[in-house]
Amino acid sequence: MRTASISRRTAETDVSVSIDLDGTGKATIATSVGFLDHMLELFARHGLFDVTIKVEGDLHVDQHHTTEDTGIALGQAVAKALGDKRGIARYADIHLPMDETLSRIAIDISGRPFLVFRTTFRVEKIGQFDTELVREFFQAFAMNAGITLHVETLYGDNAHHIAESVFKGLARALRKAVAIDPREDGRVPSTKGSL
């Protein structure tokens, strides 16, 4: 079973995450940041990952630490659940439409963390959520999952739709990249023999 649990406690947040990469999309999310909860529920559903996340954060300051630390812990959980990465597809990409928005996401589960994020928002907030925190989440996730992640919104107007397209795109691409390829016959998908 490709599952993992992570607990991460700092002076700013207390985060617990569990994930089953071979789940059915069940989500139990409680970050106390409504928009982030919504995005993480989409991530679980569209990735077909079973995800439980509970966060207590310093929301009296703002939502930054809660969002970033959730990305860190979720990334760590994905990396742990993947183990030595034997048999995975490794690479995946997707174009994800959301009404007037189209985003492109590409992933390499390489062990070399990197983020290219070419998504902009015309507004500073979606409800009470700072739009700049979308990038902060993706940065934290990619660095801690150990993946190369390219995120680009080709076009779009509505900030909610843009955020939704990149979170759903991440989920759908990650779902394909972590999938077991039976032709790999349990090998690590690299000429080096490790990732």
Curated annotation (Swiss-Prot):
Reactions listed under catalytic activity: D-erythro-1-(imidazol-4-yl)glycerol 3-phosphate = 3-(imidazol-4-yl)-2-oxopropyl phosphate + H2O
Any Gene Ontology biological process: L-histidine biosynthetic process
Location of the protein in the cell: Cytoplasm
Protein origin, superkingdom: Bacteria
Pfam families named among the record's database cross-references: IGPD
Keywords carried by this UniProt record: Amino-acid biosynthesis, Cytoplasm, Histidine biosynthesis, Lyase
PROSITE patterns: IGP_DEHYDRATASE_1, IGP_DEHYDRATASE_2
Protein's UniProt name: Imidazoleglycerol-phosphate dehydratase
Species of the source: Methylorubrum populi (strain ATCC BAA-705 / NCIMB 13946 / BJ001) (Methylobacterium populi)
